[in-house]
């Protein structure tokens, strides 16, 4: 075995099983491409990406860790989001949440 090596069992691995998901139509209205990483808080992505933001609080892209989705200028696409696991507190990114993503104190 190599240090850090992972030896998964045979078969399919289901990502984010059992978590809440949300499908959103997103349009890049900017003049440059915008790329969003797998774990970026979708509510706080580039302001040139237009979509109904409020429902996306506490969600990220439902894609494999370390990957990203690129939106070319003028491009519209539908993406699936998944709720963050854990406490639901969101810190950092653009600083628009800085605490609970949902609930009375959000």
From Swiss-Prot:
Similarity comment: family membership: Belongs to the urease beta subunit family.
Gene: ureB
Keywords linked to the UniProt accession: Cytoplasm, Hydrolase
Family matches, as NCBIfam families: PRK13203.1, urease_beta
Molecular-function GO term, any one: urease activity
Organism field: Alkalilimnicola ehrlichii (strain ATCC BAA-1101 / DSM 17681 / MLHE-1)
Pfam family, one: Urease_beta
GO BP, one annotated term: urea catabolic process
UniProt cross-references to Gene3D superfamilies, sorted A to Z: Urease, beta subunit
E.C. number: 3.5.1.5
CDD domains, sorted: Urease_beta
The protein's name: Urease subunit beta
Catalytic activity: urea + 2 H2O + H(+) = hydrogencarbonate + 2 NH4(+)
Any GO CC annotation of this UniProt entry: urease complex
Pathway: Nitrogen metabolism; urea degradation; CO(2) and NH(3) from urea (urease route): step 1/1
Subunit structure: Heterotrimer of UreA (gamma), UreB (beta) and UreC (alpha) subunits. Three heterotrimers associate to form the active enzyme.
Lineage of source species: Bacteria, Pseudomonadati, Pseudomonadota, Gammaproteobacteria, Chromatiales
Main location group: cytoplasm
Subcellular location: Cytoplasm
């Amino acid at each position: 075995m190599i240090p850090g090596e992972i030896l998964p069992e045979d078969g399919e691995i289901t990502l984010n099983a059992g978590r809440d998901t949300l499908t959103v139509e997103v349009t890049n209205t900017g003049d440059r491409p915008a790329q969003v990483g797998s774990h970026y808080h979708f509510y706080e992505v580039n302001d040139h990406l237009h979509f109904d933001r409020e429902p996306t609080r506490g969600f990220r892209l439902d894609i494999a860790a370390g990957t990203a989705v690129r939106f070319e200028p003028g491009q519209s696409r539908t993406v699936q989001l998944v709720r963050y696991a854990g406490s639901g507190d969101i810190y950092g990114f653009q600083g628009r949440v800085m605490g609970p993503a949902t609930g009375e104190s959000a």
